[in-house]
From Swiss-Prot:
Residues 96-187 are annotated as: Sufficient and necessary for DNA binding. One of its GO terms (biological process) is regulation of DNA-templated transcription. Residues 285-295 have a biased composition (Basic and acidic residues). It comes from Arabidopsis thaliana. This is Squamosa promoter-binding-like protein 1. InterPro entries: Ankyrin_rpt-contain_sf (IPR036770), SBP-like (IPR044817), SBP_dom (IPR004333), SBP_sf (IPR036893). Residues 49-69, 170-193, 274-358 are annotated as: Disordered. Zn(2+) 2 binds at residues 147, 150, 154, 166.
Amino acid sequence: MEARIDEGGEAQQFYGSVGKRSVEWDLNDWKWDGDLFLATQTTRGRQFFPLGNSSNSSSSCSDEGNDKKRRAVAIQGDTNGALTLNLNGESDGLFPAKKTKSGAVCQVENCEADLSKVKDYHRRHKVCEMHSKATSATVGGILQRFCQQCSRFHLLQEFDEGKRSCRRRLAGHNKRRRKTNPEPGANGNPSDDHSSNYLLITLLKILSNMHNHTGDQDLMSHLLKSLVSHAGEQLGKNLVELLLQGGGSQGSLNIGNSALLGIEQAPQEELKQFSARQDGTATENRSEKQVKMNDFDLNDIYIDSDDTDVERSPPPTNPATSSLDYPSWIHQSSPPQTSRNSDSASDQSPSSSSEDAQMRTGRIVFKLFGKEPNEFPIVLRGQILDWLSHSPTDMESYIRPGCIVLTIYLRQAETAWEELSDDLGFSLGKLLDLSDDPLWTTGWIYVRVQNQLAFVYNGQVVVDTSLSLKSRDYSHIISVKPLAIAATEKAQFTVKGMNLRQRGTRLLCSVEGKYLIQETTHDSTTREDDDFKDNSEIVECVNFSCDMPILSGRGFMEIEDQGLSSSFFPFLVVEDDDVCSEIRILETTLEFTGTDSAKQAMDFIHEIGWLLHRSKLGESDPNPGVFPLIRFQWLIEFSMDREWCAVIRKLLNMFFDGAVGEFSSSSNATLSELCLLHRAVRKNSKPMVEMLLRYIPKQQRNSLFRPDAAGPAGLTPLHIAAGKDGSEDVLDALTEDPAMVGIEAWKTCRDSTGFTPEDYARLRGHFSYIHLIQRKINKKSTTEDHVVVNIPVSFSDREQKEPKSGPMASALEITQIPCKLCDHKLVYGTTRRSVAYRPAMLSMVAIAAVCVCVALLFKSCPEVLYVFQPFRWELLDYGTS
């Protein structure tokens, strides 16, 4: 949570000479409409004003200095409950006057060693030097040992005898050492890509700290000249001239050496060598990456200059970065865009719908240096749409401090994404030509689209390059669990990814235009083997919790690595627990990245996310048009294939709420054309059939789906079930509909050829179906002959209250309302009712006749003439002979 200045707080120092504000803007002070791209300042008890002649085009932008200022002060009496970005990783609402390191103690029980004067490494990991090398220590009531590679405590069983690192990290370290060196890139020198990205990190760092010092523009010139040397010598010359010409402008560079180096002074000659030796080569000899302590901060960036860990920093990969005067963040590798969820969770997964052009959801990131939300023009959304030629079908935005980081999620055609990223510099030129707003034409702007990035200075594109490093060198998200959460519960997230704990990594959680406060949990990070990636990579898991402020919508989990690499992953917020449980089935599928099933699953999450977002906006949705019916149909088909009853019900509810297509009186007919009940019968899904038969839309009285609804060729669901094998359960459900039209339609409903469902069953030899329906018909007719009599519960009380006018009744009299039809049956139906007893009488007569015959046979003396003597029953013997 970001702290703010209290009115009674200590006066701050202003850099009036360079026109900077005292503190960075606070996310709590602004209400951002992510759909209209409008920033509205909230009513606060404290307002910020610049000193003197401070300019609106430049403000404090330090990710380090201002972060310390935010942590050094606190606002009192703030009970508005606004959601803010937890930049410093604290979950408490108030902070001490200044965050110092004097209070750090060893985490080992009964140690309490003061870590204020020890090395930064021991301070960050909260372990004293003695226990970091001890063979055992008690932490959390468990005997453990500190791992030198993981920089955290493990159980003793995870260590081999005499080893200071756990077996898992040693195994990964040995595998990396045995791997052969990668083949050179297309330019013949793979270290050039590393050097370019180090320069980009340095440039971003300078721009974020340009308020700290004044003078000296040579540093920026050297960096940019070296950065664009790969693109051409002439571009570098033009860039330096551009920077020199802008020296007296409002957005001129005021940069000091310490802004780059993170120390008090640094030799300028080192920078010249850094620029001159860009073409040099060096063998790659990288050590194990540095990792943080087990309770690492989800939102903080550990790149403070005083926290630089020289002894654990990896050796440089290029002689140009070999000086130890540079902080460790200069030597770190920056990630490429190789994963389908880096910059876009579906960058490699086009939509599976049958639209004319394949669509994809991605994002564009703008970092506007020296700007504040009040400088956003009212027509910002229109400017973005004009720049993109109105190609996005859906668009949503977020802002957060760090000057201003404007993140735009949008859905547009794959060809539009390719056109935008293939020549980002030309595309940005169109944006700058279309608008003369100071937001775009003054100061520095950093733009990121997929693996392309660009820098804009005073309305001109000065850098346009791409990132291309191995995936093991950057952070990205593999999966987020749960994929769908109920709005009524506290969200407990588990984020799985690569290099989540490396230096300079931030994990952000955003929902419907807002960033949420993340509460860290102790021992939340674990490492496990990755079964679907290269064995040299290690999968890390981060657990944290946060409160969901909405009932329904879509959110994103974002990871950011020093401004160069970024990755995001969508998740859903739904009020129905059954919907959440069904969508969570996709969690396992999404972990197998690169497969067709994973691509389709990610498309589904994006599409239903946009639908939930539009359904939440309602009539205030600024996106052009309505949610197309063809996209809705693809969502229905995807859910129907997986037999998700709750998801289908949710989609139908949103359809009748008007979130899909042009809702009118013909919407029922439009939905009937999808033949959902026919699809469910073909899937042989009895739960889906039962749900559809009992689904009644809002503000309607009758069921929408009927078992006698005619589809293609006049086929009804009954026809389909009668012709399929093993459809007893589905047929049973179809004939148990609320209106009981299924039984009637079994023998009366005909297709285009004149056959009934019963005829289909006879032709296919499904006589069990016929017997099943016949039993139901017989049961129905028998039930209709019975008369239900309502007998009072307390009849004795009624007798006591009523006076007895005559002798005590010997029988219960049931009064019945006169009915002509009943009287008619009583008069003319006596003979027919007596026939019901005729079979019993005949049976009794037959039994009596048999008994008489047997008796006569026993008492008579039958004679068999000419063969035997007269036969008598009394003379009959028994035995074997």
